[in-house]
């Protein structure tokens, strides 16, 4: 029997089955329980600035953030929350809002019931909800508010604000062990226990499992992977993934993608945030785009049409293909908010923009619509392929504009009400 016919040799590429978790509703968004992995983000505005926060939540929502977290750190911020919610609704935006509470969340929720009602989820950090004898009461107060208003809660441990009493206890216990672990391993265990013990306490107070999401964030990739693997192995709570303090630019993107990519491949994670430090004056929505691209490139979800483009080499000294690839990608992202309703299914479109004859025609044939631009020294002609077949050859100085027009035409005919493709309608025009 040929090796390819051996059942044990069959293609097993793909992620592990999703870790089974209890589904939680955050507003209208389902998290866990087999629901699609949810993208979320966080504002960096002063929440007391109602108009500024509305504008940023709206921008994050348009970019694709399905939930947005806002800081609630003082009375002015708490008082602003219902106005932010109302302002978003006037704009037709129903994106769930998550209140991020530290230190005095119990007091803010009690003093501002309109805030408690307006939020869709409360985030509690068990490391700073209170200290010593105050901890249990203040934690209980927040959980009881969530029960009263029917809200979900994320219990989010973070090793930058880890419960020091728990950590000290585990360190002392480890020191007296016959085979003590490294301090780093004990810290990871403290992270997991902090989340799980807090969740157990919340259940004892009366908050059901289907209202709780857990997270345990660290800033080191290998530690994050280990912490979440342990957390998933010990519970079936819905899980929020994120690498804290990931950093700026490419470093933050690479670190977050490396950590979350491994966990997602193992079936762990129900909602994710890519925590990027924005460049001065940078676009906050970048973290949403990266989260979407991570999920889409791994095959978990589709958000926008993908544009494949070659990296370039000595055969492509012209920048035309690079400029066209960027132009098409930017155009698609800008148009997606309207296309989602106008062209259902358009997010599954694949476009190829290639730079020379070596791989250009082949890659273009694999895409729904693709173009192979001429490389250095090649004839000034660019064949266009539609659904795997040569459709037309573009020439002249307006190749980029002509190809964009063909992409628009393809989308309209394939995903519009007619459901046709350019090859159906205009095959006679092809060479």
Swiss-Prot record:
Cite the annotated pathway. Answer: Isoprenoid biosynthesis; isopentenyl diphosphate biosynthesis via DXP pathway; isopentenyl diphosphate from 1-deoxy-D-xylulose 5-phosphate: step 5/6
Q: Which cofactor(s) are needed, names only?
A: [4Fe-4S] cluster
E.C. no: 1.17.7.3
Q: Which GO terms describe its biological process?
A: isopentenyl diphosphate biosynthetic process, methylerythritol 4-phosphate pathway; terpenoid biosynthetic process
| InterPro entries recorded | Dihydropteroate_synth-like_sf, IspG_bac, IspG_bac-typ, NO2/SO3_Rdtase_4Fe4S_sf
Q: Which reaction does it catalyse?
A: (2E)-4-hydroxy-3-methylbut-2-enyl diphosphate + oxidized [flavodoxin] + H2O + 2 H(+) = 2-C-methyl-D-erythritol 2,4-cyclic diphosphate + reduced [flavodoxin]
Indicate which residues the UniProt annotation says bind [4Fe-4S] cluster: 310, 313, 356, 363
One Pfam match, given by its short name, reads: GcpE
What is the superkingdom listed in this entry's lineage?
Bacteria
List the Gene Ontology MF annotations in alphabetical order: 4 iron, 4 sulfur cluster binding; 4-hydroxy-3-methylbut-2-en-1-yl diphosphate synthase activity (ferredoxin); 4-hydroxy-3-methylbut-2-enyl-diphosphate synthase activity (flavodoxin); iron ion binding
Q: Where is this region: Disordered?
A: 1-21
Entry keyword set:
4Fe-4S, Iron, Iron-sulfur, Isoprene biosynthesis, Metal-binding, Oxidoreductase
Function recorded in the entry:
Converts 2C-methyl-D-erythritol 2,4-cyclodiphosphate (ME-2,4cPP) into 1-hydroxy-2-methyl-2-(E)-butenyl 4-diphosphate.
Similarity annotation = Belongs to the IspG family.
> What protein does this entry describe?
4-hydroxy-3-methylbut-2-en-1-yl diphosphate synthase (flavodoxin)
